């Protein structure tokens, strides 16, 4: 299993990404992973789930481009939002965790959270998807 990697998407957006071989997780589908992450949000005292978004279906519906190796993609949209010290945090809320299925693996990723507690929660949720 690869470790949670930090990288910059388009040289600007800091994201964290975990690539899980299908043999390294107990989950068989994007929907199963989505449900597990939904439960983690439900269990968190400050997080609120907002929506599930089928990014693959949306991109198909607008005749968009999808890489050939991508089989399914969904986003789990949620918010921690326990403080509003200024208007600035609103620009990076709500949060989203993306789940992409390819032939042999799942890629789970999210944008860096400015709040360290939120960041650690998302890291914990995502890394817990791996078999231990």
Model feature map: region roles:
Residues 2-45, 54:
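Terminal, regulation- and interaction-focused segments at domain boundaries
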Residues 6-11, 66-67, 96-101:
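Short, flexible, solvent-exposed loop/turn segments with mixed acidic/basic and small polar residues
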Residues 16-21, 76-82, 99:
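Short beta-strand element of the conserved SAM-dependent methyltransferase core
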Residues 35-87:
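Ser/Thr-rich, low-complexity intrinsically disordered terminal regions
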Residues 87-88, 100:
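Short active-site-adjacent structural elements
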Residues 91-95:
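Short, surface-exposed coil-to-beta transition loops
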Residues 96-112:
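Beta-strand/loop substructures that line and gate deep hydrophobic ligand-binding cavities in soluble
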Residues 113-132:
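C-terminal partner/receptor-binding element of secreted or periplasmic proteins
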């Amino acid at each position: 299993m690869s470790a949670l990697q930090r990288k910059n998407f388009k040289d600007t957006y800091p994201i964290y990404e975990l690539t899980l071989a299908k043999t390294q997780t107990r989950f068989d589908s994007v929907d199963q992973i989505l449900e597990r992450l939904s439960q983690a949000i439900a269990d968190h005292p400050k997080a609120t789930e907002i929506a599930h978004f089928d990014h693959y279906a949306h991109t198909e519906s607008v005749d968009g481009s999808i890489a050939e190796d991508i089989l399914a993609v969904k986003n789990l949209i949620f918010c921690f939002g326990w403080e509003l010290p200024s208007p600035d945090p609103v620009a990076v809320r709500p949060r989203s965790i993306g789940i992409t299925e390819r032939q042999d693996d799942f890629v789970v990723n999210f944008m860096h959270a400015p709040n360290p507690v939120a960041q650690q929660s998302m890291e914990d949720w995502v890394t817990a998807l791996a078999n231990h």
